[in-house]
Each structure stands twice: as structure tokens, then as C-alpha cells.
Regions:
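Short, charged helix-capping/linker segments at alpha-helix termini
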Residues: 6-14, 24-42, 56
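Helix-turn-helix DNA-binding module
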Residues: 119-130, 138-155, 169
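C-terminal edge and immediately downstream basic/flexible tail or linker adjoining helix-turn-helix-like DNA-binding
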Residues: 85, 119, 147-148, 164-186
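Amphipathic, Lys/Arg- and hydrophobic-enriched alpha-helical face
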Residues: 16-34, 49-50, 121, 173
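Arg/Lys-rich amphipathic alpha helix in sigma70-family domain 2
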Residues: 49-56, 67-89, 110, 162
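N-terminal module of bacterial RNA polymerase sigma factors
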Residues: 1-22, 184-186
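Internal acidic/polar
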Residues: 83-110, 114
């Protein structure tokens, strides 16, 4: 398809139709929906301009596109880190309604974990955050992530391990999806 677009530029539209929603979702989760529209368009514009450099021996263009998107996100990294830091400083909402105690506790715990997670994401080195978010949000495999970032698969594995360790430590060393039981005071 990319090779064909060298002679028939309109053939590139198939690549856009196939992958634009996934690229948009990934960028939206990294930078917000407003920036996602622009960066998704910029990703495909850059891909179109660079299509002569694409390795046509590769069956799937997804890693290449996510690599371009990640590089564009890199230009916005400082704003992304500021956004995560700002989220971590938001005050907890006050719920004046009467709800079930367990629901209120669960919501408060989730809110606090969200703030700690945002702060931890902001504190991650960009190279670790990129690997983590390509795997978690873009749902790329280790191999696809390696191709997207032009690094060996072993580097992806080590960066992911370090990112997960840092997040685990920032979240108190436990899985944030598991509710903590109150100790029995018998």
C-alpha cells in the first residue's frame, strides 16, 4: 500500500483509514483530545512525506506510524509532564451526596491513586514513559514498540520493567486495582 502510494498518492488514504483511529487514541491519551486531532494529522502528513523511506519489507506499518506519532509527542513532552504534575495537584472533590460508604471509599481511593499515578508518569524519564504508553495505551507488542522507537526488543523490556517498578513504588508497592482491606481490630 505504501509502495503503491509512490505512484498513486491516493492509495495512502487506505493507510489512513486503517490506522488513524488507533493513532488518534494513542495521542489523545498522551496529550488530550484537542492535541490529538492535530498530531494525528501531523503523523499522517509526516508519514506521507516520508513514505519513500518506509521499509516495504515490513508487513505492518503500525509500528512505523506509532514511531512517528511518538516523535511528534516528544515535541510536546514538557507540556505532557506539566499536565501530569497538574493532575497530581488537583484537590480531591467533595461529595455532598449520601452514598454507600464502600462506594465513597472506593471512589476516594481511585481518585488518590489517579493523582499518584499522574505524578509518577510525569516523573518517569521520557524513554521509559514512551515504552510504557506505547504498550499500555497503543497496545503495541514489544516487537512493534521496538520498531516504533528504533531500539532493540531487550531495551523495550528493560525500560518497561523500570517504568513498572517506578510506578509500583510510587503507588505504594501494590497493585492499585486491588482494594485494601481494613485490618481487623478484634
Amino acid at each position: 500500500m505504501i509502495e503503491r502510494s509512490q505512484d498513486e498518492p491516493e492509495a495512502f488514504a487506505e493507510l489512513f483509514d486503517r490506522h488513524s483511529a488507533a493513532v488518534h487514541r494513542y495521542v489523545a491519551r498522551r496529550l488530550g483530545t484537542q492535541a490529538a486531532d492535530d498530531l494525528m494529522a501531523d503523523t499522517f502528513a509526516a508519514a506521507f512525506q516520508q513514505r519513500h523511506r518506509y521499509d516495504t519489507g515490513r508487513a505492518d506499518a503500525r509500528p512505523w506510524l506509532f514511531g512517528i506519532a511518538t516523535n511528534l509527542v516528544g515535541r510536546h513532552r514538557r507540556a505532557e509532564a506539566r499536565r501530569f504534575r497538574a493532575l497530581s495537584r488537583l484537590p480531591a472533590p467533595v461529595d455532598h451526596g449520601q452514598g454507600v460508604a464502600e462506594l465513597a471509599t472506593a471512589r476516594a481511593d481511585a481518585f488518590l491513586v489517579g493523582h499518584r499515578l499522574a505524578a509518577a508518569l510525569a516523573a518517569l524519564p521520557a524513554r521509559h514513559r514512551d515504552v510504557l504508553l506505547l504498550i499500555a495505551w497503543a497496545e503495541l507488542s514489544y516487537e512493534e514498540t521496538a520498531r516504533a522507537l528504533a531500539v532493540p526488543v531487550g531495551t523495550v523490556r528493560s525500560r518497561l520493567s523500570r517504568a513498572r517498578g517506578t510506578l509500583r513504588e510510587a503507588l505504594g508497592g501494590s497493585d492499585p486495582t486491588v482494594l485494601r482491606e481494613a485490618p481487623d481490630h478484634a
